[in-house]
Amino acid sequence: MKHILLYILATSTLLSCGSDTKPAEQSTAPAINFKTSSVPVPFAGNWISETYLSDIKEHQSPRKAQENIEECYIQLPDNTLRPSTMVINFHEGISDLVTVNNNGVFQLWEKQGDTLSTLKYTIKPLSRDTIKIDDKLFIKINSSPAGNEPRILEEILFKGAYITKKGEHIEFKSNGEVSGFGKYKYYKPLIDYFDAGLQIDQVGLGETADKMEYFGFKFKRNKLELYKLKCDLYDEVDNRCVEVSYGIKAYDLQKSSGE
């Protein structure tokens, strides 16, 4: 289900993610009332699992990268007491995590009603662009929001200028817009592949942001190849393709030097 992640992220005003899931640690709630002890969070922003980011840089395949992570993304608020969601595998999430400052230590707590119930994660800043959530590293990224859904692959994989074999200039922007690509004005790479019909990396191209035509894609370092989708197995009951592969190559794009 391509829209599971969007549904999860929409349940909270903020988001989250990391590497390997760690069992919840039971602890006594902070003595200070969490409803009144609001302080600035010095490392607010969008944070992505270092494991996921490294895999994307090495293999350039979101589908492959999704196989190696659990906690993967979180958006931390500007101030404590505001909710966040820890995104798990880009498929589900732990919502309503409350950021608190417990005697100088920033933590994420689960709550029941208005009561902090369970210490879920401890956050330790390491540098301006790196934090540790429990024992997992997260890297700060500048992902443009799309409602409550972050544009992650747009920022870390697609963004940049490209040239076609005909010398046409195309630009994929981090906000999900594309220019110079004929009728296509928007693009949306899929980040969640835990469903039928998602056996290959896919990206949507559309004249509008809410109606996309999906293509299979392959990155070969600075080369982006887009393919028509080939349906190998169609489900007559659900009226959808449940197994796909790469079909005819539709576009061959070369990323400009320096991107």
Segments and roles (model prediction):
Residues 127-191:
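A charged, solvent-exposed segment within the mature domains of Sec-exported extracytoplasmic proteins
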Residues 19:
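Short, conserved catalytic or interaction motifs in soluble domains
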Residues 29-70, 138, 149-169:
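Tryptophan-anchored aromatic micro-motifs
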Residues 23-37, 53-54, 105-156, 199-259:
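Beta-sheet ligand-binding and adhesion/scaffold domains
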Residues 1-4:
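Positively charged n-region of N-terminal signal peptides that target proteins for export
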Residues 15-16:
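C-terminal motif of bacterial Sec signal peptides marking the signal peptidase cleavage site
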